[in-house]
A protein has these predicted regions:
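Terminal presequence/propeptide segments associated with secretion/organelle targeting
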Residues: 1-407
């Protein structure tokens, strides 16, 4: 993030090129921090351990052995211990090399996921070629980020999971990944437009050091993934028994149905939450976001078009102002559970009227994929009146507003 921001701040063109990628990476980073914070703050690991103890005690009271619930907890612990370092490697590999830079994208795809061009009658003459997307990325940023990712991977991942070319970096470049990357970018043709690569002519194909880097990175990933998948099969077999034991132990309690990828409704109430003596309230206002706009010179995320400051500080909200507070309410909280894929889902009141669109969760809801905390987890929705206000005052979409017959 720091590398991207350095180049983005220095050049408007680079900022536009990388804004979406930067925002996505920053959001994922913040999400991970929030999830870990929630796991710690609510003692989730302790809660899960206590719940496991409850299942173990229940199993000990069962009069006869039932193969469907005969969980081998010792084996499961051993499997988790074996799988944990592999999952870490896969995570670090993905964070470092999966679509982080244009170089890594091309290197890891040139020999595996690219369609071959040329006559099928002459396989050695078949080639792959990358489209010209030079307007989407910056060479200097790409090179520095590539070096940083290689260096970080070398530091945090055990040597047994390093690609073979790391030995070249150690022997010929003194372990300096920045010097190696300079050499790599000068000698590889992966980033040059119009270059053809011939995967079926191995000798010719592997003359490009960028191709070698990509192939060795992919080999590391496949080897680790293969081991992890083998363990995952054994883990699933034990977890299936664990799930069945849970269901039988709680036979009299309601259970969620397996409703993934189906259209469904969830129910909740509008309301805030209290944490550490702080009362969150349940909605935000135009006034609060204007205060953030004023701090834009200190916080980049608070920057907005000048028209936004003008519209939201005018106090002229017309029919979009709340009838009780007289303010333009921007977002509100509910005690619904929100997860990936929910963003943009309509939110209706008890009369079936659209009141907002769900789009996020509060900081304290980020561990809800593991455990939903009824006291703290909240769904954030954008108030439909704010949406209409923006359509009207900023977008001048009068016809759309009339068409939907908004009240």
């Amino acid at each position: 993030l720091a590398i991207m921001k350095k180049y983005m701040d220095a050049d408007q063109k680079v900022r536009i090129q990388y804004e979406s990628k930067y925002a996505g990476s920053a959001n994922y980073w913040k999400n991970s921090m929030g999830m870990n914070k929630c796991i710690d703050s609510i003692g989730l690991i302790r809660q899960k351990a206590e719940y496991e103890g409850k299942i173990r005690n229940w199993l000990a009271t069962q009069p006869k052995k039932d193969a469907s619930i005969d969980v081998d907890f010792n084996k499961l612990e051993q499997l988790y211990a074996q799988n944990r370092p592999l999952i870490k490697v896969i995570s670090y590999w993905s964070e470092a090399f999966n679509r982080t830079t244009e170089f890594f994208t091309r290197a890891t795809n040139v020999g595996t996921n690219m369609p071959l061009k040329g006559s099928a009658n002459n396989p050695k003459a078949q080639y792959v070629e990358f489209a010209d997307n030079s307007d989407k990325w910056n060479y200097a940023l790409d090179k520095e980020l590539t070096a940083a990712m290689l260096e970080n991977y070398a530091k945090v991942v055990p040597a047994e999971y390093h690609p073979a070319f790391f030995q070249t970096v150690a022997k010929k470049f003194g372990g300096n990944f920045y010097k190696y990357t300079d050499w790599l970018y000068k000698n590889s043709k992966l980033l040059k437009n119009g270059e053809k690569f011939y995967p079926n002519d191995r000798k010719k194909f592997l003359k490009d050091p960028g191709v070698v880097v990509g192939e060795e990175l992919v080999n590391v990933y496949k080897a680790v993934q293969t081991k992890a998948l083998q363990l995952r099969g054994e883990i699933k077999a034990q977890e299936k028994k664990l799930t069945e034991a849970k269901l039988q132990m709680e036979m009299d309690l309601p259970h969620y149905s397996d409703a993934n990828f189906t259209m469904r409704l969830s129910y909740g109430q509008v309301g805030g939450y209290k944490i550490g003596g702080f009362n969150s309230g349940y909605y935000t206002t135009a006034e609060s976001i204007v205060e953030k706009f004023k701090q834009a010179n200190k916080v980049a995320d608070y920057k907005a078009e000048p028209i936004m400051m003008k519209l939201l500080s005018s106090n002229d909200y017309g029919p979009y102002a709340d009838k009780t507070s007289g303010q333009l309410q921007l977002c509100f909280l509910t005690n619904n559970d929100i997860t990936g894929g929910n963003s943009g889902s309509p939110m209706f009141n008890g009369k079936g009227e659209l009141i907002g669109l769900a789009f996020d969760g509060n900081w304290d809801s980020l561990s809800s994929g593991i455990n939903f905390d009824r006291e703290l987890a909240r769904c954030i929705g954008v108030d439909i009146r704010f949406v209409l206000f923006m359509m009207d005052k900023w977008g001048h979409a009068d016809r759309l507003i009339k068409e939907i017959n908004a009240k």
